């Protein structure tokens, strides 16, 4: 018996509001992250990821307040990312109730930051978020590059080598998003997910491209992911977390069924 695989709904939050709309039935306010997080908690999600995409620094206090509110309502692990640039940011988020903190651009600018964070707070709460885009031609060996700034800025870093380096530096988990697949509903980039999962000794969360429940199964069975992250298929009520878990279980994936 391996470890049960995890389903992780993701909330993108801007200035304290969930964006990429949420259309739950009978949610009074589709933009309130606390209400939405609580809904996912009650629906049997294994974890929740909260990505703060707020550009401005002034809003950080809003974020901490929101994290505190979510943590008081939610009894599953909560990962928070976005704008994490200093050890102080991590401390503040953990104190507010986050269980794990995701580091993205700051890791690229200063890889030592990940090492310092893991030494200070423990690898178990440091997630490195990787946004990767395929840069190889179809005929060549697959190669993916790390992009920052929401996928706009190429770094020249090879995604597989970078994932290895980050786990060497102490990352306890990799949150892997395919920029090519994000928002397409065509499924995860399975080759990318598999390449990273095979390269690192820590759990990999697959993200980007989920359009149906079979995609979740493929991420685990073909991609080797330990967890699957999705936003729109859950937000828009196309599928419930419970339906997703039952579908994955029936496909032979070990799940925690509540």
UniProtKB/Swiss-Prot annotation:
The active site lies at: 12, 131
Provide the protein's localization.
Answer: Cytoplasm
The annotated pathway is:
Amino-acid biosynthesis; L-histidine biosynthesis; L-histidine from 5-phospho-alpha-D-ribose 1-diphosphate: step 5/9
Q: Which GO terms describe its cellular component?
A: cytoplasm
Q: Pfam families from the xrefs?
A: His_biosynth (PF00977)
Keyword flag Cytoplasm:
yes
* Reported function: IGPS catalyzes the conversion of PRFAR and glutamine to IGP, AICAR and glutamate. The HisF subunit catalyzes the cyclization activity that produces IGP and AICAR from PRFAR using the ammonia provided by the HisH subunit.
Specify the protein name.
Imidazole glycerol phosphate synthase subunit HisF
Q: What is the species of this protein?
A: Alcanivorax borkumensis (strain ATCC 700651 / DSM 11573 / NCIMB 13689 / SK2)
């Amino acid at each position: 018996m391996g470890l049960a695989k995890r389903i992780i709904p993701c909330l993108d939050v801007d200035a304290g509001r969930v964006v990429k709309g949420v259309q739950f039935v009978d949610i009074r306010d589709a933009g309130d992250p606390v209400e939405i997080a609580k809904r996912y908690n009650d629906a049997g999600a294994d974890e929740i990821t909260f990505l703060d995409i707020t550009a401005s620094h002034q809003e950080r206090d809003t974020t901490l307040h929101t994290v505190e509110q979510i943590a008081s309502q939610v009894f599953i692990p909560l990962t928070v990312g976005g704008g994490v640039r200093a050890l102080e940011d991590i401390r503040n988020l953990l104190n507010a109730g986050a269980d794990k903190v995701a580091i993205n651009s700051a890791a690229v600018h200063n890889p030592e930051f990940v090492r310092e964070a893991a030494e200070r707070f423990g690898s178990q709460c440091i997630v490195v978020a990787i946004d990767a885009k395929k840069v190889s031609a179809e005929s060549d060996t697959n190669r993916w590059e790390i992009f920052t700034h929401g996928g706009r800025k190429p770094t020249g870093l090879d995604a597989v080598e970078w994932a290895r380096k980050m786990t060497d530096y102490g990352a306890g988990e990799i949150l892997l998003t395919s920029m090519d697949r994000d928002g397409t509903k065509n499924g995860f980039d399975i080759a990318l997910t598999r390449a990273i999962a095979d390269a690192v000794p820590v759990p990999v969360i697959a993200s980007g491209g989920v359009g149906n429940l079979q995609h979740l199964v493929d991420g685990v069975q073909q991609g080797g992911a330990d967890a699957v992250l999705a936003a729109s298929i859950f937000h828009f009520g196309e599928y419930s977390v419970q339906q997703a878990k039952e579908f994955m279980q029936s496909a032979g994936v070990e799940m925690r069924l509540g």
